UniProtKB/Swiss-Prot annotation:
A motif (DEAD box) lies at residues 718-721. This is Pre-mRNA-processing ATP-dependent RNA helicase prp-5. PROSITE patterns: DEAD_ATP_HELICASE (PS00039), HELICASE_ATP_BIND_1 (PS51192), HELICASE_CTER (PS51194), Q_MOTIF (PS51195). The gene is prp-5. It catalyses: ATP + H2O = ADP + phosphate + H(+). It holds the Pfam family KH_12. Residues 797-945 form the Helicase C-terminal domain. Its EC number is 3.6.4.13. Residues 232-248 have a biased composition (Low complexity). Its main location: nucleus. Belongs to the DEAD box helicase family. DDX46/PRP5 subfamily.
Length: 1194
């Protein structure tokens, strides 16, 4: 016998090289003269399986030792042949591994103590015969090792094929309903008796009573033969084969252990098992009787007769119903894979089942291969009729098992009508179709698809089947089946809704009414002694001296006059002193007491008046009074700004105070990496300075777990007028709605138009409004100059101003404002050519570049900065002396903030504005600012303002306030619409279903407008002899309706109108034949190619891309070839808004002529299609085009 690959036998003593040569010679001899014995050459694990089983069954010592030596185990070290040898196991095994060869008979040595070694073939034959007798008994199943069972199992891929293959059988008589009912009652009675027996055993029933019970059971069994005991090593008794073939049915108590212990150890040549079906007239489900009957027919099966099912299946150690449970599991899998059955699920109470009737469904996955092997054995042999009969018996047995379980579980009191959908019997069982095999993964997925419950999870096919088959009894489902999520996942609408919700960046809403929040202290104001004795007259005089402070509200504190009266802590006062702030500014004098008292404040003050310190110092006192921020707590104070530059500036201003008070401040704004800001927030921060967009991103990030506003009690909106503009208002309100209601809100700005008041008041409670120097007023320290000039003279004047500025002092800064990003870069290039060191900043630049540019400008690295209006708010540069508005601002607030970049903190500055004659809309705001600040208005500017007001009154122009807009939500919708149009344009074949059907409303409106325009441009098809009146009537017909014009001679007279129309037609026909063309006459081709029918399509007012689509040679040639018509472009092109005058050529149109109405209609419809597609493409291109083709806003 060939040495096994995993043999652990020691190598013989001697030289390794010599041994290698001997082995090589031995291989040669084996190949040359070795006998051919395929059975012995086979390395199938069957031999080892039965050796292991024999060893377990307790064979005598001689056989056990011989088997062990045949295994070449490590125990053979004690043999004389291997004494003194050294092991070279690794090298020997690696060399012999994978070689299934035979030893030559002439080289067989007497080195083994096993006398039966030479007679292995005979012994193998006897063992094979004994295996047939042993297989199927209780001990053969229970004592088989698990690894042997794993080796015997077939591959999972062949399971379905084996189950579908028919087997031999003999015809049997079907059971009647009465017999089935009686059988079920007997089984139920047997189960109850078994439970009673089990309880009796637990109560320590005497052994005598047990033996008596066993004797009674044996008498009732009438000599039925069962398998031998589990631990009996004795051979099968020959008397067992002579038992009666058809014993009486077993009606007593059914105890498998007792039967197995007291039965005679008999074995039939045909493997049997309790619970198998007898092919005679034995009823399904009578295990003992069936086993006895099959055992009685063992000799016939051994002699070659194929009238018996080959059911060589082991008996489970957990009960005698293991086989039926396995078959039942297979049937359930077939139910899951069927297409015609619908299984309803419902929750039921799980019963307390006996061990023998326990459902093995949870372990079905472990026994799938074994069950498939059993069904294959049943359907293995016999004629076609036998296999069909075997299929029927298996089906009945599965139905019986299911009915039995339903009776035992008592799901419902009513009878169960569950039908098991089994596979039909193959018509040609010998030729199996491999393609019909069900893949295991497909079967598993098919089973999962049926777990969905409810009406929403049913497909159309399931609904039709349900109507066809009627109501089907529900089936229980358990907690492991997750039906809800699977049903939601299969709904495409829910997927789209979930995707859109995820993309929307929603902030998690917080219901503060259900939270137990710690109370906060907002009132820290204690009125100083010096202010308490001040009278009302003195107070009014003081406020007038302080730049005319105006306040509105109730119980307003009196303004302070020095830092010591503000109630600030010592570290804050020390920091103020170190920064060189001698005394508070007017806005600080009045705002600090009001904010310290816990009131909501609206502060309006001129630019450069110290508004940042007015809300920052009370904020520090507010934060220090509360508990420290720990864990997942959010910030206590939140400051929101409209621009990134202002955000960084406030962050820099707070750093000295935060360092002194050991507070953490985080600046969160767009353009920088969000991961760094998230990391800082995770470490904890008491103060956040942010822009609204980035703050929403942080609040919505990771489901709201990055940061939150639960502890935010101090909110500041700097430049509040722009924050509450319609561009920011939706985002700001979304943030306010997630802050606790008892917050303190502070709003500051240099300009506060009345249009914003309504928005600010809805987020404030009993606010105090403080105005210093008036609303939207330029500081008096700023000298304002307005010059009206042409566009070409601006640059020379700019060079002149810069030359005058830097001629006296080099260490000054100048800021130039322009309207557009392109203009900023162009002006930067021109100034660099003239030798001026400058830099530019606008929204198209990267945020890092913007930050570095501002820093270099403040340090004096570049003295000149060119910027758009993003630098108009909050930018504070100490040495900024000159502000030039190269492009005039279009509203008052923008002018005030631009001019306010100079003349800050009491310093002086100059603001120069260039305005052209065409910018009359800007003249009104600039003139108003000059008047409010007490400076003279130039005469030319005043004339422009008056002219603009007259245009507004006449309705020729519309005055704009500089505020309003549709907000970022409108921008998001526009981007989404453009993206969907791009997807439709570039989608591949088969992707039609991926596009949203509910396109944005703008697309629908655009299509409708295009359709209406085309309809108005298309004329009806008329004949050459049709009248003008008739043509006009056809123009009145709704678009798309193509009607044929008919000759006047073909019309039927139907009254006075018809006669009049006929007369007009004849007159027009005579005029046309005479060649007398009249203005507006639709047909103007009198050449030889003129057709009997014609139509016109006006294309003058359509976009250029649409006109090109219907006039280029390629498209026209295709239409001519397809229709055989004549297509001519007529008329002249007129720009939008212009109309052709009397006697001029009409607008550009296309004339289509043909011999028949059909060809003209076909050509007209094709041209209409091209015109529509061109119009839509032009609209899409226009919407996709960025506002500036050079930069991308990040």
């Amino acid at each position: 016998m060939a040495r096994l690959r995993d043999s652990r036998s020691p190598s013989p003593a001697g030289s390794l090289s010599a041994r290698k040569r001997k082995d090589d010679d031995r291989r040669d001899r084996d190949r040359r003269d070795g006998p051919v014995d395929h059975r012995r050459r086979s390395r199938s694990p069957i031999d080892r399986r039965y050796r292991d089983r024999d060893r377990d069954r307790g064979r005598d010592g001689r056989d056990r030792d011989s088997y062990r030596r045949r295994d070449r185990s490590i125990d053979r070290r004690d043999d004389d042949y291997y004494r003194g040898s050294r092991r070279d196991g690794d090298r020997r095994r690696s060399r012999d591994r994978g070689l299934d060869r035979l030893r030559s008979p002439d080289r067989r040595r007497d080195r083994s103590r096993d006398p039966d070694r030479e007679y292995r073939p005979r012994r193998d034959d006897s063992r094979d015969r004994a295996r047939v007798r042993r297989e199927g008994t209780a001990e053969s199943s229970s004592h088989r090792r698990d690894d042997v069972r794993a080796r015997d199992q077939p591959k999972p891929g062949n399971t379905t094929a084996k189950e579908n293959e028919p087997a031999k059988s003999t015809p049997t008589q079907p059971q009647t309903e009465a017999e089935k009912k009686a059988e079920r009652l007997r089984k139920l009675q047997a189960m109850k008796q078994k439970h009673a027996l089990k309880e009796a055993k637990e109560a320590d029933v005497t052994a005598g009573l047990t033996r008596k019970l066993f004797m009674e059971m044996d008498q009732r069994a009438s000599g039925a033969v069962v398998g031998s005991g589990t631990n009996s090593p004795a051979p099968a008794s020959p008397a067992a084969a002579e038992s009666p073939a058809s014993p009486a049915p077993y009606v007593g108590k059914f105890d498998p252990k007792a039967i197995a212990r007291n039965a005679k150890p008999a074995r039939a040549s045909s493997p049997v098992r309790l619970g198998d079906v007898k092919l005679g007239d034995v009823k399904v489900g009578a295990p003992v009787a069936a086993a006895a009957s099959i055992a009685g027919q063992g000799k016939g099966a051994a002699s070659g007769k194929a009238g018996l099912l080959q059911t060589g299946r082991p008996i489970s150690t957990f009960g005698f119903n293991k086989s039926a449970d396995a078959l039942k599991t297979t049937a359930k899998r077939k139910i899951d894979m069927g297409d015609e059955e619908i299984i309803k699920r419902k929750l039921v109470k799980l019963p307390d089942l006996a061990l023998e009737n326990a459902d093995d469904t949870p372990y079905a996955d472990d026994d799938v291969a074994e069950d498939a092997e059993k069904d294959f054995d049943v359907l293995l042999a016999g004629t076609e009729e036998d296999r069909a009969e075997a299929q029927r018996l298996l089906r009945e047995r599965r139905e019986e098992q299911i009915q039995k379980e339903s009776m035992a579980m008592e799901i419902d009191s009513a009878p169960s009508n569950i039908e098991v959908a089994t596979e039909p019997v193959a018509q040609n069982p010998t030729a199996m179709d491999v393609d019909d095999e069900v893949d295991p993964l497909d079967a598993f997925m098919a089973g999962l698809e049926q777990t969905a419950s409810g009406e929403e999870s049913h497909s159309k096919a399931d609904t039709l089947t349900e109507k066809k088959n009627g109501n089907i009894p529900p089936e229980a489902y358990f907690s492991d089946d997750d039906y809800g999520y699977e049903a939601d996942g299969t709904d495409p609408t829910s997927i789209l809704a979930m995707a859109s919700k995820k993309k929307k960046k929603d902030i998690p809403t917080i219901d503060y009414s259900k939270l137990d929040l710690n109370p906060i202290r907002k009132n820290f104001w204690v009125e100083p002694y010096e202010l308490s004795h001040m009278s009302e007259e003195e107070l009014a005089e003081l406020r007038l001296e302080l730049d005319g402070i105006k306040v509105s509200g109730k119980n307003i504190p009196k303004p302070v006059q020095k830092w010591s009266q503000c109630g600030l802590t010592r570290p804050i006062l020390d920091t103020i002193e170190s920064l060189g702030f001698e005394k508070p500014t007017p806005i600080q004098m009045q705002a600090l007491p009001v904010i310290m008292s816990g009131r909501d404040v609206i502060g309006v003050a001129k630019t450069g008046s110290g508004k940042t310190m007015a809300f920052a110092l009370p904020m520090l006192r507010h934060v220090k009074d509360q508990d420290p921020v720990t864990g997942d707590d959010g910030a206590i104070a939140l400051i929101m700004t409209p621009t990134r530059e202002l955000c960084t500036q406030i962050y820099s201003d707070l750093q000295p105070f935060a360092k002194a008070l050991k507070l953490r401040v985080v600046a969160a704004y767009g353009g920088n990496a969000i991961k760094d800001q998230i990391a800082e927030l995770k470490r904890g921060a008491e103060i956040i300075v942010a822009t609204p967009g980035r703050l929403i991103d942080l609040l919505a990030a990771n489901g709201g777990r990055v940061t939150n506003l639960k502890r935010a009690t101090y909110l500041v909106l700097d430049e509040a007028d722009r924050m509450f503009d319609m561009g920011f208002e939706p985002q700001v309100m979304k943030i306010f709605n997630n802050v606790r209601p008892d917050r303190q809100t502070i709003l500051f700005s240099a300009t506060m138009p009345r249009i914003i008041d309504a928005l600010t008041k809805k987020v404030l409670r009993d606010p105090v409004e403080i105005t210093v120097g008036g609303r939207s007023v330029v500081a008096p320290e700023i000298t304002q100059i307005v010059e009206v000039m042409d566009e070409g003279k601006k640059f020379n004047r700019l060079l002149e101003l810069l030359g005058e500025l830097y001629a006296d002092d080099d260490d000054v800064r100048s800021l130039i404002f322009v309207e557009r990003q392109e203009k900023a870069d162009d002006l930067l290039r021109e100034l660099l050519r003239r030798g001026y060191g400058c830099m530019s900043i606008h929204g198209g630049k990267d945020q890092e570049d913007r930050n570095s540019t501002i820093s270099d400008f403040k340090k004096g690295v570049c003295p000149i900065l060119i910027a758009t209006s993003i630098a108009a708010r909050g930018l504070d540069v100490k040495q900024l002396k000159l502000v030039i508005n190269y492009d005039a601002p279009n509203h008052l607030e923008d002018y005030v903030h631009r001019a306010g970049r100079t003349g800050r903190a009491g310093n002086t500055g100059t603001a120069v504005t260039f305005i052209t004659e065409e910018q009359e809309n800007c003249a009104s705001g600039i003139a108003k600012a000059l008047e409010q600040s007490g400076q003279p208005v130039p005469d030319r500017l005043n004339e422009m303002r008056k002219a603009w007001k007259e245009k507004v009154k006449a309705g020729k122009a519309k005055d704009a306030s500089g505020f309003g807009g549709k907000g970022l939500e409108k921008l998001d919708k526009d981007r989404e619409a453009a993206r969907m149009r791009e997807r439709k344009t570039h989608k591949a074949e088969g992707e039609e279903d991926d596009v949203k059907e509910d396109a944005p409303a703008e697309d629908g409106e655009k299509k409708d407008k295009t359709k209406v325009a085309i309809q108005s441009a298309v004329s009806a098809i008329v004949s050459r002899d049709a009248s003008k009146a008739e043509t006009e009537d056809k123009h009145a017909i709704p678009a798309g309706a193509v009607k044929a014009g008919h000759h006047a001679s073909s019309g039927k007279s139907g009254g006075a109108l018809d006669k009049a129309a006929s007369a007009i037609s004849e007159i027009n026909a005579r005029l046309a034949r005479a060649g007398q063309l009249r203005p507006g006459q639709p047909i103007d081709n009198k050449g030889p190619d003129a057709g009997a029918f014609h139509a016109t399509l006006e294309i003058n007012d359509f976009p250029q891309k649409a006109r090109w689509a219907v006039t280029n040679r390629t498209n026209v040639a295709k239409i001519l070839e397809a229709t055989g018509t004549s297509i001519t472009t007529k008329g002249n092109y007129y720009a939008p808004g212009k109309e052709p005058g009397p006697g001029q050529e009409p607008k550009l149109y296309i004339l289509i002529e043909g011999d028949t109405e059909v060809v003209v209609g076909n050509a007209l419809s094709e041209l209409t299609r091209l015109l529509r597609e061109g119009t839509m493409a032009a609209a899409d291109a226009e919407s996709r085009a960025p506002a500036s083709g050079r930069y991308t806003i990040t």
